[in-house]
Amino acid sequence: MSLNEFEFQVAGIKLHGQYYSPQLVKAVVLLVHGLGEHSKRYERTVVPFLTKNSIAVISFDQFGHGNTKGKRGHHPGYSFLLDAIDQMISKAGKLFPEQPIFLYGHSMGGNIAINYCLQRNNSIKGLIATSPLLRLAFKPPPWKMTLAGILDKIMPSITLPSDLDVNAISRDKSEIVAYELDPLVHDRVSTGYSLEIMKQGEWAIEHAPEMKIPMLLMHGTNDRLTSHLASEEFASKASDTVEIVLFKGGFHELHHDLEKEKMLEKIRRWIESQIQNSK
């Protein structure tokens, strides 16, 4: 497997990306990470598993995250998040011509990936969403939502602590330690970022019947960060192109949780079935 890094521009901001290429490539996964983390966190489990199975991976650090320039936890607008995926799909097509491209989004990245497929390009072969942030698994205090609404009108770029419960990401304690020690992980989010993500999550649920792309949706039933019930609602409203898999007792980061091997194997089998179905 070879690793190559690159930069690209969206909204005048340089975003950092990389792609991982196995010797034999039969498909490409475009990976979209979640809030407060970065794309290289997937190098421990997801990337080696996929490349070992002849699936190339291309990923990038979103606005305000990882090695991408800009204010931590803030983006210039939701449409620019979709523009970044447009550019990455174009790059993936040039790097791996005629190979099927699958979009894979986790948490906030799942929100963005789902909305991309509903609102924009439908040329990708399939969509994978893990623990997508369609709704939070908890209700923020009313005062906090009121404050966020006020700040969004006067200072939408101001960032506040995300208050993410680190212990909720995985049942594997070593993963919690790794998360806390990662220098590129942060806990900042702007009011404009968080409110727009939640708005787009509700929009996605409402428009779920319009999903035309084959989709694999996975969520843990003990996810305390994003709502597995919202994922179930999305799947129930969508057509039969959406397959939902629930992991009983699973925490937020299924790819770092106790059943990660089972979860990754499901992704592999699903990708291969989509490739076979298109022949």
Region roles according to the model:
Residues E243, K248-K279:
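Catalytic active-site module of serine/aspartate enzymes centered on a nucleophile-bearing elbow/loop
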